[in-house]
Amino acid sequence: MYLSPDFIVIGSGIAGLRAAIALAPVGRVLILTKAEPTESNTGYAQGGIAVALGDDDSPDLHAADTIKAGDGLCDENAVRVLVEQGPPYVQELVDWGTRFDRDADGRLSRGREAAHSVRRVLHAGDATGREIARVLWTRVSELKSVETANHALVTGLLVENDRVVGVRFYDQLGFPRDARAKATLLATGGAGRVFRETTNPPVATGDGVALAFHAGARVEDLEFVQFHPTALNVPGAPRFLISEALRGDGGRLINGRGQAFMTRYHPDGDLAPRDVVARSIVREMDMTGGSVFLSLSHLDADYVTKRFPTIADMCRQMGLDLARDPIPVGPAAHYVMGGVETDQWGRTSMPGLLAAGEVACTGVHGANRLASNSLLEGLVFGARAAVAMQEPPAAAAMASGRRRADHATPITDYRSPGSHRPLTASEVRDLMWKSVGLFRTREGMESAVAKLEASYAAHREALATARADDADAWKQFNLVTVARLIARAALRRLESRGAHYRDDFPERDDINWNAHLVDDITL
């Protein structure tokens, strides 16, 4: 195993793999994964990858849709990078053998999803992320300068003279290891598992955000958590994602009375932005006292089952026929727009540390991510981070250039002594779902923050006496850390914008809150 590689990549999703491929020709690369290498959010991405390749499309149109969905908070320079550099990187995937669906004349098939003005979403059935990951892993496996350590428990970043110089981790046999490198990339994915209801796999616990925060890096915009409107809503079953592409192909949301309802909430109906659809579903459930369903019975049954084989199979396991039965759906935590603050090259506020993909906050998504932009973000910014990793580390901290909400109430004003009993993972997830979920209030969030602050302190104390390789203790600590950061940010933003909705501040406030919230270890 390389313990003195040139570059370290933590994570094995699209951002980490694309970075490793770019770094391999110039040095030795160590990829650290917390589970099996193919277990990442990338592999669970169904809908597709959005990119302006059609004759009726352009980077300008893609940028406009992205910015509109972001509800006034997108970093427009980052958006330009995404939409302009996306096409060549996606073409590279095609050249490498990615089997995107094609139409009858052999052209790439383009789907439409919510808030897109044209069809621009390339897909591989309903398992696009898995197909992209297959191609990237095939290329990585051919690179002799890239080594992968599976089931590695990363417990901290090595910091010397205010610069990240490597990582501390435990290998799959439980032996402690320190690996030092010129640059370290966080590509650890999302944090959906902080919430009780989520479409994310078990690995998505926000480890990268916690690692960066404890090393001294800034985090940004963590109040913006996207709740996907249509997860399978069967009691006792996992919240399996029911792709937005189903609605893009004509699927309709109906209430328990069989009535379509989305046009009552938004002029774009079933293809309104995700945050709008998610809240509308909950309101419809409350109003009718029943469930909400996705109906595809008016579409061709053969087309539905062939276009969405993975979803059809999961529904079949639940005793449901995707093409004929109303499918019960409801919102679930899906994606975190915020993360470790970075510039457009993945550089964080800590020299030697970079971040790309969902763990990072480039500002490209603003307050609400446009559907199917996540795979594109990982691809583009993973490759760009690899370029920055080859440069000499900056002498000073990175500056993103984004406007900050420095007037926000300091979080110390919200702290209460409380009891130092550590919350269990299940208690954290229940608390976040109930108090920092789709609908937020000051009272609920103040209570959540107080409990999470106390639990954070208790977990820190517990770690001091726990075995250093106690994986459960570290996972609990990371989970509480990220939950605490999300709750703190949500409490401080006194408005509603994008995925952040407060019953006590229901309107968007551009005068006071058209800015980004930053947190770090000193606050």
Model-derived features with residue positions:
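Glycine-rich loop(s) and the adjacent beta-strand/alpha-helix scaffold that form part
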Residues: 183-240, 373-384
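Short beta-strand to alpha-helix junction loop
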Residues: 74-87, 120-138, 149, 198-206, ...
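Glycine- and aromatic-enriched mobile tails/lids
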Residues: 1-5, 22, 28, 36-38, ...
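Conserved N-terminal glycine-rich FAD pyrophosphate-binding loop of Rossmann-like flavoproteins
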Residues: 35-67, 71, 237-240
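Conserved redox-cofactor binding core of oxidoreductases
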Residues: 95-175, 180, 187, 196, ...
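An anion/pyrophosphate-binding glycine-rich loop and adjacent beta-alpha core
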Residues: 37, 211, 217-327, 388-392, ...
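FAD-site-proximal beta/loop scaffold in flavoenzymes
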Residues: 156-178, 320-364, 370
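N-terminal Rossmann-like FAD-binding beta1-loop-alpha1 element of flavoenzymes
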Residues: 7-31
